[in-house]
Amino acid sequence: MARVAVQLTNFTGGELSPRLDGRNDLTKYSSGCKTLENLIVYPHGAAARRPGTSFVAEVADSDNKTRLIPFEFSTTQTYMLEFSNLKIRVYKDNGSVLEGDKVISGITKANPAVVTATSHGYSNGDEVVITEVVGMTELNGKRFLVAGVTTNTFQLTDKDGTNINSTSFTTYGSAGVSNKVFEITTPYTTAQLFDIKFAQSADVMYITHPSHEVAKLSRTAHTTWSLDEVEFTNGPFLDHNITTTTLNPSHKSVGQTTTVTASATTGINGGSGFVATDVGRLVHVKDGHFQITSITSTTIVVGTVIIDLGINSATTTDFALGAFSDTSGHPSCVTFFEQRLVFAG
């Protein structure tokens, strides 16, 4: 009896449950597998072995969790963001994004090795990559932490803080370049990394976390990035006041500093009145709103008028507190929907 090799040309069914063994009456059976390991299934049906991986760099802190988030401007401009405790590092083209060259003019044979680079601008703890050194080539292509910083020199240590002993290295000849690993300072701690949500449009990524103000990560050049708090200038606001509490602003026009006095704490933060965490919060009053800049008491705040308040009388009950603040919390989710930026949570 002839033996027939069955051709399998479609794997879009993926891995099938053991309960489907022998269920050739199901449409998915002919496009499924019992096990698909180290394979990638393409939308057209074919399956291919997954690509390999390579070691690019050690993360900033290997002892704690790190989160990787893609930053995709286009098919040719894609970055990987490494979020760790209070910082972001950026990767592109199989390597870390580095700051500009600092020219090396000398390296000692000592313990620790001391590098001379005029006006390098480094701080203790910075991570640098050294390349193009003639003579003491043992340092080329390696990463070090900076220590013992002076204006024109710095010592080399490894990631654990152990001094780099260069006494047995080849004598420094000439040249060499030092580049600091590019980093962005953030407010996000290790414990908060996996609660971050994000949405990207072109070169801007919006980042939310319930404990922090909405942030905007912007890229203007390969090594020019900024992380700034988003300034909301027109809301959103909570429900309007329905109590008899009134607000009496001293000034009402755009740009003016105003002292606002409440007749009571009722209707303000659940009856607690104004609190320290309200600094930076918007308050809608009549036709406009102001932003709180300081707290005098539970019934008195100082702020800057953003939009004319439009009050004819001295006081009004028509006010609403901003929805986003350190008091009420910040949005935990963000996305784009029909070309609009949407927050939730």
Task: State where each predicted segment sits.
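Small/polar beta-strand repeat architecture
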Residues: A2-D25, G95-Q200, H209-P210, F232-K252, ...
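N-terminal beta-propeller domains
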Residues: M1-G100, H212-T257, S313-G345
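Post-transcriptional modification and biogenesis factors for structured RNAs
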Residues: V260
